[in-house]
Amino acid sequence: MRGRVATTAVSLLLLTTAATLGSAGIAAPAAARCIAIGAYDPAASQWPQSIDRYGRIVGRRPAIVSYYHQWDATPFVASELWGAWDRGAVPMITWEPMSYEGRRFPLRAIARGRFDRYVRRTARAAAAWGRPVLLRFAHEMNGNWYPWGAGLDGNTPHRYKAAWRRVVRVFRRIGADNVRWVWTPYTNQFGGVPFERFYPGDRWVDWVGLDGFNWGYGGRSYSFKQLFGGSYWMLARISRRPMMIAEIGTMDRGKTHWISQALRRQLPRLRRIKALVWFNDGDNGVDLRFNGSQGALGAFRAAVRNGRYGATRQSLLGLSSDRRGC
């Protein structure tokens, strides 16, 4: 997401509407299972009980829990990983080659192996964890809001692909075969350079994904179909890997209708999308949460209780191993 800084503050997730929608139980498994629901809650890193709260309020446990880490330290933090795993979810780490302290990690230097020692240490930590984990390295590369973004610091699609392949190669040599690589550009609706130029190839990727947000800038609202439709078909052309929406959110205005249309009508038509992770936080002054109002939360709950959103961690991991549909 543009301009996001990872936070460890306790999230306000669901507190305003919990009293009203309160003690609903977890949805029972349904017969048709195709799409996994994932959660990003900034509190989950330090307070894994927020994942339990998500399940109680939404009515379905998340199959993916999303975390964000920069290159200041090894991202495979046992408390985070177990916090997700013990609750039936696979952890997904967005691994950002930048630093809170301003240290630079240029793509060209990554590709040449300058940071291999750090990458190897991270790969060993992943291998020691041993269980499957989704890893998003250097996401939204087709935009210009991250240091590895297109056109910044001499970055090119060629350099990006070389850096991606270098990192994956190091992990494979270490034996971190439990890592599933998730390549995630921003949608071509707003992403700047067409993302297909940055794709490193199916040999180097386990999942392909998209990030996209209905910010409401300029007073204009974009539907799910407008945000993701064209980019979905481009992904389908360049890769045979399973797809996910790795970040999604929408502004407050019209949120209830937007969520209902997206999850009930528009997303199910994009049949290769097997997971959706809602970015349940704010950014750039926009409240992107699905629970920003009781109406929006009600729409989200009603949509994801449908059996099509019942994919589990087990089905996800089988999917990303053998590339079959659900």
Give the ranges of each region predicted by the language model.
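Secretory targeting and sorting signals
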Residues: 1-29
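Boundary/entry segment of secreted carbohydrate-active catalytic domains
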Residues: 30-73, 317-321
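Substrate-binding cleft of secreted/luminal carbohydrate-active enzymes
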Residues: 33-42, 242-326
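Acidic (Asp/Glu)-rich catalytic clusters
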Residues: 51-60, 74-93, 121-130, 198-203, ...
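Aromatic- and acid-rich polysaccharide-binding/catalytic face
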Residues: 60-70, 195-222, 244, 279-281
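Glycoside hydrolase catalytic-domain groove-lining segments
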Residues: 77-96, 203-254
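Substrate-binding cleft of extracellular glycoside hydrolase catalytic domains
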Residues: 77-183, 279, 291-293, 300-304, ...
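Aromatic-lined carbohydrate-recognition surfaces of secreted/lumenal glycan-active proteins
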Residues: 164, 168-194, 240-253, 278-281
